[in-house]
C-alpha cells in the first residue's frame, strides 16, 4: 500500500504456508505448538470470544496455524490474522503536509476502531523492525479500545524486539535468546505471582531505595499506587478488574512488576554508564532528581545529545516515570552478550525510567518514555533487602 490510501484493514487473510525468511531462520527449532498453547492458556478464552491476530508474514509465521487451531478448539471465534503494515508504506506518508497527515491519522484510527468493535482479544505477534510495524493511528485506536473496559485484553508477544541493551534501546537479537525465551515461557506461574505479591507488600511498607555500584542512589514511596503484575495471566476475569491499562496488556514471557511511585517523593540520582541518544553515546550520564523532576544533568561525553533529546521530549522527559523489577528465573543474562533478555524481565533486573506514566496510574503526561536497566542494582525498603546486586533475595523469589 502506497500513497495516502488506508491500510487494508478488512483483508483478514487466511493463512497459507510462507517461506521462512533469513530474519526468522534462528526460530526454526522452536516448538510452535507449545508456544501457541502457552498463549491460549494465558488467555483463558471463553466460548464465543472473538480473537484478532496481528503478524509479520515472514517472522513467526509458523505460529499462526497452531494459534488459530487452538483458538477454535476453545470454542472462541477466530476472526483471522491481519498483517502488520509495511514500514515502507508508512514512510511514504511522511512527505505529506501536516493537514494531510492529520487527516490520514484520523481516518486510519476510525477505521481500525471500527474493526476492533468486533474483538475481545488482540494478539501482538513478533515483527521485524524496519520491515513491518503498527501505525501510530492504529496504536492510538488500540489504547482507546482497551480503555473501554470489560473483557478487552491483549497478549504482547514481541520476542526479538524485547532484546535490549541497558540503555533501554534495542540491541541485535541473538539466536541463543530464542531458546532462553522459550524456556522462560515454561515457569511456575503461581510461584511467580506469589513472589510478586510479597514484593508488593514490602514495597508499600516504607521508603524504597535503589542503589548501583556506579552511583545510582534513588529513593521514593509507592503509597497506594497500583502495581502492574506481569504474571502471565490474561484471563477475562483479570481484565474485568483491571485498575490500569497495563493490566490488560499481558506480556509473554512474563515476569516484571511495575509501579509509578508518588512523583513528589522521588529524590536522588540515577547514573547510567552508557546511553545512546541519536547517533551519539553519552557516557557516565548522571540525572539528579528532586521531587520527581530532573533538575540537573551531567555526563563525561555527549551531554549535548542528552539535552537535545530531553528538550525534544518536553516536560515529561524530565519527570521520573516508574520502577520495574524482574522476576522471571529463566530470563537470565549471559556472559557472551551485553543484551538483556525480554525488556529486563529477568529475576533481579531493575528498570528506572523517565516520561509519561499515566498507563501505570501516575500523573505525568506527555509523549516521551525512556527506559534504563540496571542488572546489578540493590533494592531495599527501610533496610529490608528485596534485590541484592542484581539477585532476588531468598523469600523474594
What are the roles of these predicted feature ranges?
Residues 1-17:
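Bacterial N-terminal signal peptides
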Residues 15, 21-267, 277, 389, ...:
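Active-site bordering "gate/hinge" segments
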Residues 27-37, 190-192, 199, 203-208, ...:
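Charged, compositionally biased interaction regions
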Residues 67-73, 139-140, 226-227, 286-288, ...:
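Short, solvent-exposed amphipathic alpha-helical segments in soluble enzyme
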Residues 206-208, 216-218, 255, 266-270, ...:
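Structural beta-strand/beta-sheet cores of well-ordered domains, especially the beta-sheet scaffolds
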Residues 214-215, 224, 289-293, 298, ...:
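Short acidic-glycine loop/turn motifs at beta-strand connectors
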Residues 252-298:
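Oxyanion-binding "anion nests"
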Residues 267, 280, 296-363:
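Dual-mode signal for accessory low-complexity, basic/Gly-rich regions
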